[in-house]
Amino acid sequence: MAKKTYDLLFKLLLIGDSGVGKTCVLFRFSDDAFNTTFISTIGIDFKIKTVELQGKKIKLQIWDTAGQERFHTITTSYYRGAMGIMLVYDITNGKSFENISKWLRNIDEHANEDVERMLLGNKCDMDDKRVVPKGKGEQIAREHGIRFFETSAKANINIEKAFLTLAEDILRKTPVKEPNSENVDISSGGGVTGWKSKCC
Amino acid sequence: MSVANSSHRAALLRVLLILLVAQNLARCQLTPAPVQICHSFHCFGEMCYQEAEFANQIAECEPEEHHCELIQLTTVHYMARCSPRCEGEIGTSYSPCLLANNSAPSPGPCSLQCCSGGPLCLVLSLGHLTIQEDKLVLTPPALVRNQAVQGVLCEGDSRQSRLLGLVRYRPERGVQEHALFLYNHRRMAITGDDVSLDQIVPVSRDFTLEEVFPDGELYILGSDVTVQLDTAELNLIFQLPFGSHTRTFLQEVARACPGFNPETPDPEFLWLSRYKCTEQKPSQRGWNSASGTWPECTRKGEDQPSIGGGGSWGGALLEAVQAGRSERCDEELEGADWEMSAAAGSRERDPAGGSQSDDLRPDGKGLLVDQSFRGQDKPDSLLTRQNKSKSEITDMVRSSTITVSDKAHILSMQKFGLRDTMVKSHLVQKEEDYTYIQNFRFFVGTYNVNGQSPKECLQPWLSHGIQAPDIYCVGFQELDLSKEAFFFHDTPKEEEWFKAVSESLHPDAKYAKVKLIRLVGIMLLLYVKQEHAAHISEVEAETVGTGIMGRMGNKGGVAIRFQFHNTSICVVNSHLAAHTEEYERRNQDYKDICSRMQFCQVDPSLPPLTISKHDVILWLGDLNYRIEELDVEKVKKLIEEKAFHTLYAYDQLKTQVAAKAIFEGFTEGELTFQPTYKYDAGSDEWDTSEKCRAPAWCDRILWKGKNITQLSYQSHMALKTSDHKPVSSVFDIGVKVINEELYRKTLEEIVRSLDKMENANIPSVSLSKREFFFQNVKYMQLQVESFTIHNGQVPCQFEFINKPDEESYCKQWLNANPSRGFLLPDSTIKIELELFVNKTTATKLNSGEDKIEDILVLHLDRGKDYFLSVSGNYLPSCFGSPIHTLCYLKEPILDLPLKAIRELTLMPLQTEDDGSQLKNHMDIPKELWMMVDYLYQNAIQQEDLFQQPGLRSEFEHIRDCLDTGTTDTLSASNHSVAEALLLFLESLPEPVICYSAYHNCLECSGNYTASKQVISTLPTFHKNVFDYLMKFLRELLKNSAKNHLDGNILASIFGSLLLRNPAGHQKLEIAEKKKAQEFIRQFLYNSP
């Protein structure tokens, strides 16, 4: 019973156009709740959640970013250090899907090279308003060699699965380490410095 | 695998003398006595330790005798006494083996010494080993002992005991090297020279010592830890005894490994060279070679730490291996007398010399460790009764289903975060949510065997008439009364009785041995039904001696604690002081056991567990409480009448418990069997010896805890081996069993709630406003927008932080005040965003290269980031616009579309007026003309012109008039207009005398012709402005009688505005300033 509370810390990032439901996806995963009122995220928020995978306790620190275009240059600076990035679009919003390739380019430019990526087509409960067929999502994911899920934060479809899958993929790439390994920072707790550490 | 207990069995040391002194030391450290008390006796052989009444008189020492001295006169003759000196009587014919002093007023504890002239020595203590590093300041230079453990070296089928000692060498601060010293040791190793160096393994970069799990063998709780030692040259397998001791050792070794940091130099191990000779002469290995020394080594140098490398180091290791973790003495190891003790040691040896091992000794007591486990090969009648052979038992143990995982990790795991502690404490709090009570049957038995070997089948005691219990707790006392058992903590009886018990366990079930623990004659065995083995964890065993001098193991207790499912259980077997009148001693023994029995916890940061900190305590043993106040015949008569109730009243245990002197909170079942002591061996007859002891219920079983039901409590008259009868009790004990699903659920809830807590502890604030619009921003006109930060429940530090690749957190024209701060929970702070466009930022805003647009990042330390958007519109102004742009602006600047301004502002400055551009221009900016003309009209005689400041409000008015072309409405003081003119010149992005001409001007300063030449090279508009201004200034000077201006004043004011250093606003050198003034002055006094 005397196990460590968590062995690893994974930093995940949610990106995608404004209004696709990134915050709701995170809220569903972290608090298992959903809020219909839309409050645009103006800034960077994060939550933690501890999960157990393959007998390892993993602390996920999930960063939610502002999706509005005017913040893009700033938000890309948060990509660095993320081990996994969830790129979210809205299946009822064609524009958000078209922007996927732009977001992917952003990842290429700003994220760590070995970052684990995942594509989510959110709001899949709203099938009557769907404008992006599932196949298109699958296709672009296939082209880029990344995983794809259609999710619904509202109906709680695939949310947990998506996060766990992403964490598992990261875990698979993480070399087996002794608990005391220093490669993984387990001491920082909720410590977040943004890019502050770089400059001052 | 059952080598597990070889640490108890293996003949490791323990000279009575050493122990006595050590115990004495330890005790006195605990309770310093004003008067020294020492044992004082002469005794021979077993008499010395069997019963206190035969020896061990206590004597009060004379005032000047501060030391206790113990002397071994011959191998069987011992003497103890008070002594005035610590050094012993060196030079006398006998060997003063050990001495100790302990109390004031003598100068510090005088070490004991039976060891050597070397720096190290046998130090002692009961129990296990831990070494204190701080006493390592000893010689030789920086050579220290860290840890040692006794283990079994496995090579193929061979098993040999080795002492493993981790030795650290620290030649200087910050540098250290380690080596693992492996020692052979003589079976009943007592002193350092019973130990010989086998080999040294340097802890180099390729050194690893890791726990391994042999294929096909399942991990058994409490079983040996198998470790593999690997270096480039070596591959050795050791089995180390289970427990915290080994754990510590492995951790120490792991810490000693140099790692792969390339910064640290490779260890060189030069210090090991002095031991090389022993390595080079493997043929001389062994304690018996050349009387245990290697002359060629001993004579190498004074600083050698050892006789033959093995001697004193080995001795230290012996001590290390057995040293107690609870009581330790900080002996100084000086003045040691190695030679003498070595001599004593050699006297002790078999005179025949060459014998390789003690199994050849005539008394046959010293079986080799490995051989002792093959007892069933001997033609022993024991084997015929059994229905299970030893090997079967072992197999069962092997096949039990405990997995390796957890314990193995614990070995290397040290970090326990706060979160972990919280999870654990929550789990304890919510235990009821995920556990249910399930009854398990416990068999508890106690048997004082009076030093006998098993001669009868134990089944009547252990398994007749009962269902197969889930757990067996079987305790023995007086297992072995021989000298060896006492001195050397080694007895073949352990194996014999272990086997006898194992063979007589209930035939309907298979059992796995969990643990065996023994202190001299007190042994406790714990078995579990094989199917429950997986639910036993955290097994620890400890011993407490309360015998001779309050510490020796002839009396005392042993205990095993473990976790069964989720219930913690402690089983104690004790043998308390004898004799009817000694009940107070028994009470004290009980209390000592309770207070001194301490179990290490898995988490080393937690304090050790005591007996009382367990859910269930089962206490068995020969408690030795007697029936008093009745004469023997009366007792026997009452027994015959089965009038046990009458007898209870006289039972000391009952009366002492009733008086709450002992066993508080414990319960004992009703005694429905006749006293179990004392019988003539082999019969059911009461003691017919001379002493004719009165019968007594010596052997008892008590319990404490919830959900315990005693099903039976009885003696077993059928067994006649001993002068005691065995007692047994069967319990149903309600154990907290984990419902895995509920446990997972509870754990999940706890983790969720901790996550929630952690999320709630992320600093978070609310902002009254996030979007800021600054409307109609004008040149040099401050605009302020404010907002409040309202903090949540977590104290937090906030700060506006720089965006990537930017040098400040916002644009130059903006400022947040304050830009950082600290907020208490629920507190509020007002932040003002101040927007101010000055000469540095105006031009780009005019041109549209910059906009009133910015995003500020408000960062909370350890928390979120908030983006604040700033936007607005800037009203272009003539201030900050280039001269040539203004010359093309025929309309007021604010009447023009932004695009036109932008184009004109970005238009390159032409040095040659080639006329290809717009023809439609003015010679000088109309705004300049307006201001100068105003001054010419109104201020030509104004005193202090350019020297008295204007009014801010009037400046804004002037600016607006200029920018909107409404100068006819201009009404402002002369000073304000004058200042506006200066500001206008100052805010020109390119000064009137272009940057490129700056150095030329300074050079020609003083040469008017050359100066005029430089001016003529200026772009037309600039030249026009310069000429115009000079003309105006000359006009002013004409009125100097009225306005008191002179050339110097004007030159100094305008010099720095018209001539600006291209390097920016660095502080100008006075010489440079002077030259600039002089340059202007020329034009003030000369007409062109």
Curated annotation (Swiss-Prot), chain A:
Q: What is this protein called?
A: Ras-related protein Rab-10
Q: What class of enzyme is it?
A: hydrolase
Binding-site positions, Mg(2+)? T23, T41, D64
Organism name: Homo sapiens (Human)
Phosphothreonine: residues carrying this PTM: T73
Q: Would you kindly state one Gene Ontology biological process term found in this protein's UniProt entry? A: endosomal transport
How does it get modified after it is made? Ubiquitinated upon Legionella pneumophila infection. Ubiquitination does not lead to proteasomal degradation.
What influences the activity of this protein, per its activity regulation comment? Regulated by guanine nucleotide exchange factors (GEFs) DENND4C and RABIF which promote the exchange of bound GDP for free GTP. Regulated by GTPase activating proteins (GAPs) including TBC1D21 which increase the GTP hydrolysis activity. Inhibited by GDP dissociation inhibitors GDI1 and GDI2 which prevent Rab-GDP dissociation.
Q: What is its main location?
A: membrane
- Which cofactor names does the annotation list? Mg(2+)
Domain of life according to the entry: Eukaryota
Q: Does the keyword Hydrolase apply?
A: yes
GO molecular function: any one?
cadherin binding involved in cell-cell adhesion
* Localization annotation: Cytoplasmic vesicle membrane; Golgi apparatus membrane; Golgi apparatus, trans-Golgi network membrane; Endosome membrane
Q: What does this protein do?
A: The small GTPases Rab are key regulators of intracellular membrane trafficking, from the formation of transport vesicles to their fusion with membranes. Rabs cycle between an inactive GDP-bound form and an active GTP-bound form that is able to recruit to membranes different set of downstream effectors directly responsible for vesicle formation, movement, tethering and fusion. That Rab is mainly involved in the biosynthetic transport of proteins from the Golgi to the plasma membrane. Regulates, for instance, SLC2A4/GLUT4 glucose transporter-enriched vesicles delivery to the plasma membrane.
The entry's cellular-component GO terms read: adherens junction; cilium; cytoplasmic vesicle membrane; cytoskeleton; cytosol; endoplasmic reticulum membrane; endoplasmic reticulum tubular network; endosome
Provide the family line: Belongs to the small GTPase superfamily. Rab family.
Indicate the quaternary assembly: Interacts with MYO5A; mediates the transport to the plasma membrane of SLC2A4/GLUT4 storage vesicles. Interacts with GDI1 and with GDI2; negatively regulates RAB10 association with membranes and activation. Interacts (GDP-bound form) with LLGL1; the interaction is direct and promotes RAB10 association with membranes and activation through competition with the Rab inhibitor GDI1. Interacts with EXOC4; probably associates with the exocyst.
Amino-acid positions noted as binding GTP in the UniProt annotation, renumbered to this chain: 18-24, 35-36, 40-41, 67, 122-123, 125-126, 152-154
Tissue occurrence: Expressed in the hippocampus. Expressed in neutrophils (at protein level). Expressed in the testis (at protein level).
Q: Residue positions of the PTM N6-acetyllysine?
A: K102
Mutation: T73E; reported impact is: Phosphomimetic mutant. Loss of GDI1 and GDI2 binding. Increases localization to the Golgi complex
Question: SMART domains under this entry?
Answer: ARF, RAB, RAN, RAS, RHO
Arranged from A to Z, the UniProt key words for this protein are: Acetylation, Cell projection, Cytoplasm, Cytoplasmic vesicle, Cytoskeleton, Endoplasmic reticulum, Endosome, Golgi apparatus, GTP-binding, Hydrolase, Isopeptide bond, Lipoprotein, Lysosome, Membrane, Neurodegeneration, Nucleotide-binding, Phosphoprotein, Prenylation, Protein transport, Transport, Ubl conjugation
Motif (Switch 2) on chain: 64-81
